[in-house]
């Protein structure tokens, strides 16, 4: 049987010094026979999705201790993409994912922890911790801080979120008073932003991967029911320890749970619910860490067979994550996918032996357990707060309408192809991605004129100056992992196109990425990126670009000979922006750029450079 890793520092005469230090943290004689479970918290006062996490690590710790473990908490960093967006702060967002993964690895391995509870929530924190969990491969369970409640105002007919505040701010017809009202109303509570943006998408995907508990992605942060998720996560961590160290059960480990089949399940869910394109980047990165052979070709294959069963903000103003929960949450979507023959239901989870068992118990349309029905009635209270578990509001009824409700069955799918697609062509040899859930069907095939910019800032300036016209393809390059560096999100350009009335009349192509709040014909992750010699670096103003989503194509409409000639010319000049950009690239960012791969590899470090 495997021995507790912690014995390295808790057993033997020569470890007297280490035990003395452990005792100084509060451990006593009887504790040295117990598993030491690390709690990776991510509390910070900078991020609304994390402001309420301060005491929650200790909540989990006390539960771990109650059921026979020793808990030791530490914190990671957390960057708020919305606050960092639109300026050089966004250069740090994606690189922070690697720092988070490294910091969890450093703490867990330095102290020989036996298991791990990951308390995450927002955009790069869940992916960073997921990468670390698959790297470490010790018993691990995820529990997130939960989604924010959607905002409300008398000035809008629909519920609000962050994107509404951003779009109206750039709408010249909106009064200052209306902008201020949207700003005050869009983000009313603690939690991750209320739509199917990156944070919520990733927290939902941990349910499909099998690494978190039902409801992890959908119970609002303010609801009392989420407290039980935290307590149960502590108990599950101890149970996983017993299964691995006491029974050598491989399905107690992240790599025994998050297998190739589980990654396919997660991507199937992502496509079905029209999640953020960032999830592709993060799933690819996690797969690399777990040595799972899951790649862009698998995503492309799945995107052609998985229907879209759910459409949530920003793809529609009608539904937010709180509405997904009322409809049965992620387990309900997984249930519909399973009945459509689209899932690997023998995959393991941290809370059930198989996904099939989990669905049987947690799918609101199938279970007879009234406790499950009550759980999924947990709803928003509409009271602004930064306090977790501060309300216990419940809907009067569940949304189980699978023909016209928030979650559809396969027979009533919103579209027969899902909400994400991978496009290939001479402009993106290794692929690029588009959230088709947010694209109007009238522009699924779009031919436009290239307007080339070598920074997000230049593109924003041009859009706000009304220099971008209907029929243009805005090309923003040298914003990839190396070229940015840091692969900035392009939420401001897409939001401003929408506010200028060009959301259905223009396209945007970039080697950068998009916020989960992006909608419209926004194509990102062009690989290889310009800084790595990608053909997006060869596009010129006035070129014609054809985007063909149904046929998964994206091409620069020039001859192969002309493209080769441009490549030779660019090789001679070097693959870098023509003009020096007014951004400060620090040593930390340069170190990230030196090792970063393009988006088709998840923008992870190029291990060949390290191993070589």
From Swiss-Prot:
Gene3D superfamilies: IlvD/EDD C-terminal domain-like
Domain of life: Bacteria
UniProt-annotated binding residues for Mg(2+): 81, 123-124, 489
Enzyme class name: lyase
One Gene Ontology MF term: dihydroxy-acid dehydratase activity
One Pfam family of this chain: ILVD_EDD_N
Keywords: 2Fe-2S, Amino-acid biosynthesis, Branched-chain amino acid biosynthesis, Iron, Iron-sulfur, Lyase, Magnesium, Metal-binding
Enzyme Commission number: 4.2.1.9
Sites bearing N6-carboxylysine, chain numbering: 124
Residues involved in [2Fe-2S] cluster binding: 122, 193
Cofactor binding, note field: Binds 1 [2Fe-2S] cluster per subunit. This cluster acts as a Lewis acid cofactor.
Catalytic residues of the enzyme: 515 (proton acceptor)
Record keyword Magnesium present: yes
PROSITE patterns, per database record: ILVD_EDD_1, ILVD_EDD_2
Record carries keyword Ubl conjugation: no
Alphabetical GO biological process terms: isoleucine biosynthetic process; L-valine biosynthetic process
Positions of transmembrane segments: none
Functional description taken from the UniProt entry: Functions in the biosynthesis of branched-chain amino acids. Catalyzes the dehydration of (2R,3R)-2,3-dihydroxy-3-methylpentanoate (2,3-dihydroxy-3-methylvalerate) into 2-oxo-3-methylpentanoate (2-oxo-3-methylvalerate) and of (2R)-2,3-dihydroxy-3-methylbutanoate (2,3-dihydroxyisovalerate) into 2-oxo-3-methylbutanoate (2-oxoisovalerate), the penultimate precursor to L-isoleucine and L-valine, respectively.
Record family assignment: Belongs to the IlvD/Edd family.
Subunit field text: Homodimer.
Name of this chain's protein: Dihydroxy-acid dehydratase
Organism from which the protein derives: Xanthomonas oryzae pv. oryzae (strain KACC10331 / KXO85)
Gene (UniProt): ilvD
């Amino acid at each position: 049987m495997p021995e507790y890793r912690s014995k390295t520092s808790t057993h033997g005469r020569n470890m007297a010094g280490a035990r003395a230090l452990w005792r100084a943290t509060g451990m006593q004689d009887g504790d040295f026979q117990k598993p030491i479970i690390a709690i990776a918290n991510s509390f910070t006062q900078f991020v609304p999705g994390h402001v309420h996490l301060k005491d929650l690590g200790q909540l989990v710790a006390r539960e771990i201790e109650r059921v026979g473990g020793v808990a030791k908490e530490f914190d990671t960093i957390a960057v708020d993409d919305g606050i960092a967006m639109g300026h050089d702060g966004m250069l740090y967002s994606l690189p922070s994912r690697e720092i988070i993964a490294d910091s969890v690895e450093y703490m867990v391995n330095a102290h020989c922890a036996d298991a791990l509870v990951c308390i995450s929530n927002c955009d790069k924190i869940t992916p960073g911790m997921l990468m670390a969990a698959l790297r470490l491969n010790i018993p691990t369970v995820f529990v997130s801080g939960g989604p924010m409640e959607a905002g409300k105002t008398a000035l809008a007919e629909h519920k609000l979120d962050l994107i509404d505040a951003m779009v109206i701010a750039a709408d010249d017809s909106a009064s200052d008073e209306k902008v201020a009202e949207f700003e005050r109303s869009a983000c009313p509570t603690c939690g991750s932003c209320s739509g199917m943006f990156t944070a919520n998408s990733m927290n939902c995907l941990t349910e499909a991967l099998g690494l978190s508990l039902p409801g992890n992605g959908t119970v609002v942060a303010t609801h009392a029911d989420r407290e039980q998720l935290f307590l149960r996560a502590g108990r599950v961590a101890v149970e996983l320890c017993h299964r691995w160290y006491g029974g050598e059960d491989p399905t107690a480990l992240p790599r025994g749970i998050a297998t190739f089949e589980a990654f396919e399940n997660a991507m199937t869910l992502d496509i079905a619910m029209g999640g953020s394109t960032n999830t592709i980047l993060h799933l690819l990165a996690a797969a690399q860490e777990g040595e799972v052979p899951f790649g862009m070709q698998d995503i492309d294959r799945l995107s052609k067979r998985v229907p879209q069963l759910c459409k949530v903000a920003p793809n529609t103003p009608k539904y937010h994550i709180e509405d997904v929960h009322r409809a049965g949450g992620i387990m309900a979507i997984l249930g519909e996918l399973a009945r459509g023959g689209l899932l690997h239901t023998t995959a393991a989870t941290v809370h059930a032996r198989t996904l099939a068992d989990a669905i049987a118990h947690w799918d609101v349309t199938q279970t007879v357990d009234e406790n499950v029905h009550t759980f999924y009635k947990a709803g928003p209270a509409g009271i602004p707060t930064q306090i977790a578990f501060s309300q216990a509001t419940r809907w009067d009824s569940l949304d189980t309408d699978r023909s016209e409700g928030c979650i559809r069955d396969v027979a009533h799918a919103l579209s027969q192809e899902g909400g994400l697609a991978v496009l290939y062509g001479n402009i993106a040899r290794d692929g690029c991605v588009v959230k088709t859930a947010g694209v109007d069907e009238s522009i699924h095939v779009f031919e436009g004129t290239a307007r080339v910019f070598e920074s997000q800032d230049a593109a924003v300036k041009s859009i706000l100056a009304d220099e971008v016209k209907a029929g243009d393809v805005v090309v923003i390059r040298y914003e990839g992992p190396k070229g940015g560096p840091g692969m900035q999100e392009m939420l401001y350009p897409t939001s401003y196109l929408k506010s200028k009335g060009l959301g259905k009349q223009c396209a945007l192509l970039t080697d950068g990425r998009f916020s989960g709040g992006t909608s419209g014909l926004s194509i990102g992750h062009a690989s290889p990126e310009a800084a790595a010699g990608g053909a997006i670096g060869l596009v010129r103003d006035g070129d014609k670009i054809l985007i063909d989503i149904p046929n998964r194509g994206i091409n620069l409409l020039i001859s192969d000979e002309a493209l080769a000639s441009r490549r030779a010319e660019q090789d001679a000049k070097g693959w870098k922006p023509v003009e020096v950009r007014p951004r400060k690239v620090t040593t930390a960012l340069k170190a990230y750029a030196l090792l970063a791969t393009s988006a088709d590899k998840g923008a992870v470090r190029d291990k060949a450079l390290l191993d070589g």
